[in-house]
Swiss-Prot record:
Full protein name: 2-C-methyl-D-erythritol 2,4-cyclodiphosphate synthase
Disulfide-bond pairs as recorded: none
Species of origin: Aquifex aeolicus (strain VF5)
Catalyses which reaction(s): 4-CDP-2-C-methyl-D-erythritol 2-phosphate = 2-C-methyl-D-erythritol 2,4-cyclic diphosphate + CMP
InterPro entries the UniProt entry points to: MECDP_synthase (IPR003526), MECDP_synthase_CS (IPR020555), MECDP_synthase_sf (IPR036571)
PANTHER family in UniProt: 2-C-METHYL-D-ERYTHRITOL 2,4-CYCLODIPHOSPHATE SYNTHASE, CHLOROPLASTIC (PTHR43181:SF1)
Length: 156
């Protein structure tokens, strides 16, 4: 058995008038995350964690923000590519542990929907997905959010 651990991080600034999407779930209609794609920072962090565990290039190198193909692209496309590479290398996801740091929106009311979405996207049971919402407690300016994710991959 071979185990690999990956860590992913992403942060985006809030912008008015854009849909906020986290983990493939529409959360807020009045403000979203600034980004070249749909700005789903949670899926970006998960994608980077998987790519990192596999020793691959990171999401920004593979899906450059200067490439018009990725303008407003759904972030699930990036995740699907990482999962494809993972599968080709013979790995499966054992579990993921994610943290969203933001003063707004509150994550708790959306937690189960996000976990259900991640379960479908990743092809693993919800019980193997940990999702936590944390507040910045006065640290930094609070005009965006940060997502971090650790993934454990296993090859039998």
């Amino acid at each position: 058995m071979e185990l690999r651990i990956g860590f992913g991080f992403d942060s985006h600034e809030f912008v008015e008038g854009k849909l906020l999407i986290l983990g493939g779930v529409e959360i807020e209609k009045d403000y979203g995350l600034k980004g070249h794609s749909d700005g789903d920072a949670l899926l970006h962090a998960i994608t980077d964690a998987i790519l990192g565990a596999l020793g691959e290039r990171d999401i920004g190198e593979i899906f450059k923000d200067t490439d018009p193909r990725w303008k407003n692209a759904p972030s699930r496309i990036f995740l699907e590519k990482a999962l494809e590479v993972m599968s080709e290398k013979g790995f499966n996801i054992s579990n993921i542990d994610c943290v969203i740091v933001a003063d707004r929106p509150k994550i708790a009311p959306h937690k189960e929907r996000i976990k259900e979405s991640l379960s479908k996207l990743l092809g693993i049971p919800k019980e193997r997905i940990s999702l936590k919402g944390k507040r910045r407690e006065g640290f930094c300016e609070g005009n965006g959010l940060v997502c971090m994710c650790t993934v454990l991959l296993v090859k039998m």
